């Protein structure tokens, strides 16, 4: 077990950025392996859910290769890990109360002491993520075109560039591609790719060590700043304040800022209006879920990278049944390859059906009101219980109305039946919600995009 985890950790450390590895993989702990089932523990629910959605496929693939057989990887919650991994606080530094992140995850902020290292090493850019390796389709062609324009003219075109969309659609790939091209054109340029969570940690570290002068000196001196998943800034006032200063300094100096988020800027919960207005001052582009032809192209390209041949029929079958995002396609491909190698079979549609039977059964499930409520709640980051509660703040009322609209559009339920499933509400309340969201969809591109993403997710 220990040998496996060392192998798995080493592999992931090579593939991920230092921030990703430190934030998501390092806190995990392998528990046991028995009868083809591997159990891995996470210290809290947030990390557990994130690891399951982002890294489960890769860990499963590494495990299958290590044991030379299909492995069922299960992630479990073990809060004891959080307390076990907290460092002892130095007597000379008092613990700091912060609503940003706990002090136990602090990492050193970058300093000028590392300026002798190569620019690419400091940038945290993944060299594998380039424009050449990015599969383009209707869903992302505008985002790619904007990214290329920015890469060719950093600081003068679309500043800031704000890319938003669901998980696994290629936003991170695009911003790394920009960084790679800018570095290729000018190796001396000062670039930093950073996940929003790591930026939060840098702010806390500066606060703890009274090092905001060094913090500002570093971030304000960049030529290109790439911030991934900025929705993590929501509700963190000191982080937002410092980022606002950095934003203003970089824009004034005609330096380029590129930002990604899982949602449209105005929909980010807990984000300062000043920042939202700054985000809107540049170019905001949606990255949509890939269409069928694009999904096929992605599968065929990934298969070539894995050194296997995928027939068009097999690629179309997989792409037709798995529609949500690129990461899901990559995970499915790994499962197919592991199954094919273990059983010594060529990759046919029948083999794919066997390898992906669990995934396909989930995709083929009927849409229910309960599933709509859960999907919408996850999308807007609220509790499912809020769907049938009496709460009426805007951040709850609107998602509830959207869920009612989707229930009317995607199920056979009557208005009274839908109302009953939303906390016993009257059918006129449901009718009002349906009409309101339908009207908003016709007038607002943002609303139409939200509904499109939700419908694609629900239909699988």
Curated annotation (Swiss-Prot):
GO MF term set: ATP binding; ATP hydrolysis activity; DNA replication origin binding; lipid binding
Region of interest called Domain III, AAA+ region, as start-end residue ranges on this chain: 124-340
Region (Domain I, interacts with DnaA modulators): 1-78
Chain residue ranges for the region called Disordered: 103-122
Spans annotated as Domain IV, binds dsDNA: 341-460
GO biological process, one term: DNA replication initiation
Disulfide bond residue pairs: none
Primary location class: cytoplasm
Entry GO CC: cytoplasm; plasma membrane
Matches recorded under SMART domains: AAA (SM00382), Bac_DnaA_C (SM00760)
Entry keyword set: ATP-binding, Cytoplasm, DNA replication, DNA-binding, Lipid-binding, Nucleotide-binding
Keyword Transmembrane helix: no
Subunit structure: Oligomerizes as a right-handed, spiral filament on DNA at oriC.
Comment on protein domains: Domain I is involved in oligomerization and binding regulators, domain II is flexibile and of varying length in different bacteria, domain III forms the AAA+ region, while domain IV binds dsDNA.
Cross-referenced NCBIfam families: DnaA
Similarity-based family: Belongs to the DnaA family.
Role noted for this protein: Plays an essential role in the initiation and regulation of chromosomal replication. ATP-DnaA binds to the origin of replication (oriC) to initiate formation of the DNA replication initiation complex once per cell cycle. Binds the DnaA box (a 9 base pair repeat at the origin) and separates the double-stranded (ds)DNA. Forms a right-handed helical filament on oriC DNA; dsDNA binds to the exterior of the filament while single-stranded (ss)DNA is stabiized in the filament's interior.
Protein name according to UniProt: Chromosomal replication initiator protein DnaA
Organism: Janthinobacterium sp. (strain Marseille) (Minibacterium massiliensis)
């Amino acid at each position: 077990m220990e040998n496996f985890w060392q192998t798995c950790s080493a592999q992931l450390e090579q593939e991920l950025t230092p921030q990703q590895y430190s934030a998501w993989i390092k806190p995990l702990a392998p528990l046991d392996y028995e009868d083809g089932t591997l159990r891995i523990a996470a210290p809290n629910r947030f990390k557990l859910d994130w690891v399951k959605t982002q890294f489960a496929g890769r860990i499963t693939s590494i495990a299958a290769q290590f044991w030379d057989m299909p492995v069922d990887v299960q992630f479990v919650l073990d809060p004891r890990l959080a307390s076990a991994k907290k460092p002892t606080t130095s007597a000379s530094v008092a613990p700091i109360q912060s609503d940003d992140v706990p002090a136990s995850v602090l990492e050193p902020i970058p300093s000028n002491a590392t300026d002798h290292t190569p620019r690419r090493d400091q940038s945290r850019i993944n060299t594998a993520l380039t424009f050449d390796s990015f599969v383009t389709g209707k869903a992302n062609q505008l985002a790619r075109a904007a990214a290329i324009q920015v890469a060719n003219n950093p600081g003068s075109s679309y500043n800031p560039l704000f890319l938003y969309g669901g998980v696994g659609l290629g936003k991170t790939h695009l911003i790394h591609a920009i960084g790679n091209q800018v570095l290729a054109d000018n190796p001396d340029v000062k670039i930093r790719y950073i996940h929003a969570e790591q930026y939060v940690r840098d702010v806390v570290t500066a606060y703890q060590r009274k090092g905001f002068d060094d913090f500002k000196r570093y971030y304000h001196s960049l030529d290109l700043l790439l911030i991934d998943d900025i929705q993590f800034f929501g509700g963190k006032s000191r982080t937002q304040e410092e980022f606002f200063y950095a934003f203003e300094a970089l824009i004034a100096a005609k330096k380029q800022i590129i930002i990604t988020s899982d949602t449209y800027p105005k929909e980010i919960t807990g984000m300062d209006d000043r920042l939202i207005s700054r985000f809107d001052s540049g170019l905001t582009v949606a990255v949509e879920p890939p269409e069928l032809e694009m999904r096929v192209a992605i599968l065929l390209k990934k298969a070539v990278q894995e050194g296997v041949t995928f027939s068009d029929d097999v690629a179309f079958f997989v792409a037709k049944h798995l529609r949500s995002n690129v990461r899901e396609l990559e995970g499915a491909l790994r499962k197919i390859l592991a199954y094919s190698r273990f059983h010594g079979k060529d990759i046919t549609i029948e083999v794919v059906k066997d390898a992906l039977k669990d995934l396909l059964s989930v995709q083929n499930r009927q849409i229910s009101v309960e599933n709509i409520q859960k999907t919408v709640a996850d999308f807007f980051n609220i509790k499912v219980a809020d769907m049938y509660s009496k709460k009426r703040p805007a951040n709850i009322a609107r998602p509830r109305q959207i869920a009612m609209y989707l229930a009317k559009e995607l199920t056979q339920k009557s208005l009274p039946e839908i109302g009953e499933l939303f906390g016993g509400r009257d059918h006129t309340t449901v009718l009002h919600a349906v009409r309101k969201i339908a009207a908003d969809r016709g007038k607002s591109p943002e609303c139409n995009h939200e509904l499109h993403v939700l419908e694609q997710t629900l239909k699988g």
